[in-house]
Amino acid sequence: MIRRVALAVACLTAPLAAQDAVVRGRVVRSDDGTPVSAAEVRIRQTGPTTTTDTAGRFELRGAPTGPVELEARRLGFKPTIISLALAAGEARTIEVQLTATIITLDPITTTATREPRSLANVAAAVTVADTLAIQRGRTVGLDETLRMMPGVQAASRFGTEDVNIGIRGSSSRSRQAVRGVAVLLDGVPLTEPDGVGRLDLIELAAARQIEVVRGPISALYAGSASGVLNVISRSGFDSPGATLEAHAGSYGFEKYVATAGGALANGKGGGYLAGSYTQADNYRAHSEGNVARGLVRGDYRPAARTTISFDAQGSVLDTKLPGSLTQAQTDADPNAAQPAALFFDFGRADTRYRMGARLAQGLDATGEVEASGYFYYGGRTLDFPIPGQVVDLNFHRTQVGARIRAAEVGGAALDLAAGVDYDNVFGTDQRWTNSGGGDHGPRLDDGTDAAAGLGVYLQGEWEASRAVAFTLGLRYDAVTFNFTSAFPGKIPSQERILDQWSPKLTTSWRAGAQSLLYASIAHGFEVPAFGELSPGPGAPVNAQLQPKTLWNYELGARGSIGTKVLYDASVFYADVTGEFVPRTVGGLSVPENASSSRNIGLELAATVLATSWLDLSATYTYSDFRLLDFTSSVLLPDSTRQEVVYDGNLLPGVPQHRLTAEAVTRPLRALTLGLRFEWQSLVYVENGNQQEGVIYVPSTQPPGTTPVPFRSVPARALVQLNGQYQAGPVGIFATVENLFGTRYTANVVGNSDLGAYYEAGPGTWVSLGVRLSAWPKGF
């Protein structure tokens, strides 16, 4: 469980006054003078906000002259307000003391619901990870942070690049990307119109905050039948100064990071940039890889209630892919590569970029009406050797969106918002024969792929009282797929349009300052991916594969008990039509629709602030995801196929029970130590839910099949240690994963036609790192 602390999210629409003073200093505990990290510090009159670092330091630029009030707050502490009188051009240094008190939900802010707001007012299952939680690991993959959250499955597939992330079972069919989850970077979708979310552009070391919303948010975002993952990057306002990092560890792991940020003296502008390079041999054969990433961000506030943000990201990745193994291969050597991966030289050489701007503008003098928008352009090139072919893609992407919001409409406690999103991915798709070694042989296809998504949404929020609120939202999505081919013998042109209306109704009751109860009914919508609809631009489109839709009914509660305990709970029931049941044919994802299925889940989380130096947290996830009406065929020993009914069986690839626990202690002011524990129950690998059995795969030898034994993945437990020592500008950190060297399967490839269900996790591995920081003078 991530410790919920006060997180600063600067509201883009906050009014700005004349700004020409600077306030900097430290936030400490009133009882022992210990630095308070991740505390929110702001000027109350104007809204400039920042967050303290690990040493409790902060800097606020653009403070107005004259009398002002500075407020500091953090979860578990009583807010402190200090009155100041600032002169033009003054740089004031102060110390702010916070006193432990009853916990309230107000300081926690999330933007994943399209509006910056307190967690106390979000009627959804939301978890937020702050900077300290993000930087506790190697900052290589999002799994390092997300796997401790309830309702989330997250694991590294091969070591440094491919991360399998799922919310409420969506990872069951994930192969080379995130499915069923809308992945956002600073609120703008990375997930493409076909529902595929790639994480290449996310540099975790440059992330300030990670927000996860569990459950369908299709009323706000496309491709979010299971939830939303929003990564907030750093800016020059909240991350002034420069850092250099170097990491090294087991399996040839190395990572280097450099960042720099700063803001103008008048507080109207700021910039931030980051670059990283990661390489590793990794723990499985044929899985070595490297990736370079870069990020540039600029923010400009030319006038009151006007904010313009520019950013660009790029990544260059080159990695080998070892493939999945059968049970016999796993028993012999779990770190081996699939023989076909070696022969065909499975891998991914992927270059991506994205650049654009976001604008927020107040439209009236009262601050009740505002408009915002974004425009981004990007692209990617991909060289992708797979069984029998090499896929070469050269795609472009255009994204544009606009939104208008009116608060207190008609003088009532009613907020209305309307918006539109357009997202178009298009480009060339060429296929070549792969006769071995990943070399380009004779051409197999030469065409184009395109997916254009259009979404229009409306949302109304009504505060019936100070305690009770209602939200009603409705979104229409249409995704148009186009495939063309100029290759002889292929289908010249094909089109398929998938659309859906997605409503959502929520109500929340805030029971005082310490708890929130909510109920929601929401519709979810998820479309198939390019490769799931058609194996190539000129191949027939699978007209039988339909979108997945669901109705989700949910009850939840979050809050605190006294000054020591925070809790979060949600229970849900989902009626699903067209569930994507995982199936892998020839190494490619070819899912099938289940006519109907139902999901029942329970997600619990608790954090105990036991002492000033010890935090304890735990999560529990129960997932009973069952197929109610589903029939599929299996290969028999005599090479014939037989239809089998799987009604009542569990969806493969999803553990029914998952438990995490964490203890974080600070024995010294500069030293933080952490102990993590993860446990999950057995996982079925095929639709039959057999703990062991045999499947038959095609063979060139009589009788035309070969038996391949398999077993379900047994329950497993993992333990991790981490530590960080901060001495002024020098930070030293270490991680020990899989402390006891447990042999386990990290990921399951469900219903593989070759019985290759298993991708092993690593044994014990160690990483060490050092970070050097330089802050502006006086900071």
Segments and roles (model prediction):
Residues 28-31, 39-42, 73-77, 87-135, ...:
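Short, acidic, small-residue-rich periplasmic hinge/interaction motif at the N-terminus
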Residues 126, 143-188:
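Extracytoplasmic beta-strand/coil segments of soluble accessory domains associated
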Residues 250-279, 284-322, 345-368, 410-411, ...:
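Transmembrane beta-barrel wall of Gram-negative outer-membrane proteins
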Residues 368-384, 510, 516-522, 547-631:
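Membrane-embedded beta-barrel scaffold of Gram-negative outer-membrane proteins
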Residues 465, 469-470, 478-479, 572-575, ...:
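Gram-negative outer-membrane beta-barrel transporters
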Residues 679-695, 724-779:
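C-terminal beta-signal and adjacent terminal beta-strands/loops
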